[in-house]
């Protein structure tokens, strides 16, 4: 039987439809409905949010398919799910289940410490994390249709997401200012496919959307990432580890849409209750840094 794969154009077009929106992590149907009612453009179905994965330790794997199905049956918006880096079978199972996107995610324990999935070999579009333009273009070269900053998941600390967004956008500006004869050396230095470096030079931007993720915990955090050039926002632990998830979810969606309306963001931030408890980056041991799990 002939294998079907989706084209880059179709996959990237699907991801473009989420631009400007918020994608929320959920662990059951009830949370998925809260996210949908708050205005999320998609949900990420998983067994535990990143802060719980971090606290539990051990090996984090793909969610129980029952949870993914429960979420898919509960909402009408797109449903994403996470597979371990390099785990072909987890990704194929999720594709067979009919999820709308797969996140090849460093939040889960990598299954392969050398190879990422060849995402162009799948029909379903993939989202992947990146910290710099080299990682971004390598993932696109493998077939990713959507990117997100890695940040540092489960910390409620926005500093790493800010660092990664600034790094990627700064390197895009650097490439855009290069002469054509400098591009091959740039590709070598970034460890990136030459043709994609050339495309960055032509477009002046990434050929796929790049969302912010990893540490978004407040409406102001979401607005900040949009100010820095994010195409949208992923919120992991920040919603359902807060005192008032429904109110936090709605406020973050509105702050993402109206990210330059500072008066509105101030109003949205009033009386929300406590956000999730954050972690200072200096308190993380090197082996606990999820962002370092891919390459």
Swiss-Prot record:
Annotated active site: 82
Example GO molecular function: pyridoxal 5'-phosphate synthase (glutamine hydrolysing) activity
Binding-site residues for D-glyceraldehyde 3-phosphate, renumbered to this chain: 166
EC annotation from Swiss-Prot or TrEMBL: 4.3.3.6
Keywords, comma-separated and alphabetical: Lyase, Pyridoxal phosphate, Schiff base
UniProt keyword Protease, yes or no: no
Top EC group: lyase
Protein family: Belongs to the PdxS/SNZ family.
Protein name: Pyridoxal 5'-phosphate synthase subunit PdxS
UniProt organism field: Listeria innocua serovar 6a (strain ATCC BAA-680 / CLIP 11262)
């Amino acid at each position: 039987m002939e294998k079907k794969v989706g084209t880059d154009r179709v996959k990237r077009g699907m991801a473009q439809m989420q631009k400007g929106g918020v994608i929320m992590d959920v662990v059951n149907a009830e949370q998925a409905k809260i996210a949908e009612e708050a205005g999320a453009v998609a949900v990420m179905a998983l067994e535990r949010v990143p802060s719980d994965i971090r606290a539990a330790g051990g090996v984090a794997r793909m969610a129980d398919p029952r949870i993914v199905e429960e979420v898919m049956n509960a909402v009408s918006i797109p449903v994403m799910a996470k597979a371990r880096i390099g785990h072909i079978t987890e990704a194929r199972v999720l594709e067979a289940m009919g999820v709308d996107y797969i996140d090849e995610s460093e939040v889960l324990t990598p299954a392969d410490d050398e190879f990422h999935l060849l995402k162009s070999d799948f029909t379903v579009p993939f989202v992947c994390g990146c910290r710099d333009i080299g990682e971004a273009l390598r993932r696109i070269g493998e077939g990713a249709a959507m990117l997100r900053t890695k940040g540092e998941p489960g910390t409620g600390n926005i500093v790493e997401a800010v660092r990664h967004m600034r790094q990627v956008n700064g390197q895009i500006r650097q490439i855009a200012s290069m002469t054509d004869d400098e591009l091959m050396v740039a590709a070598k230095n970034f460890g990136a496919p030459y043709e994609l470096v050339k495309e960055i030079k032509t477009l002046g931007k990434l050929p796929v959307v790049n969302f912010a993720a990893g540490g978004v915990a407040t409406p102001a955090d979401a607005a900040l990432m949009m100010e820095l050039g994010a195409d949208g926002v992923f919120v992991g632990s920040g919603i359902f580890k807060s005192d008032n998830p429904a109110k936090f979810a709605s406020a973050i969606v509105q702050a993402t849409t109206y990210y330059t309306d500072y008066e509105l963001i101030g109003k949205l931030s009033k009386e929300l209750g406590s956000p999730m408890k954050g972690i200072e980056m200096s308190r993380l041991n090197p082996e606990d840094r999820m962002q370092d799990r891919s390459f």
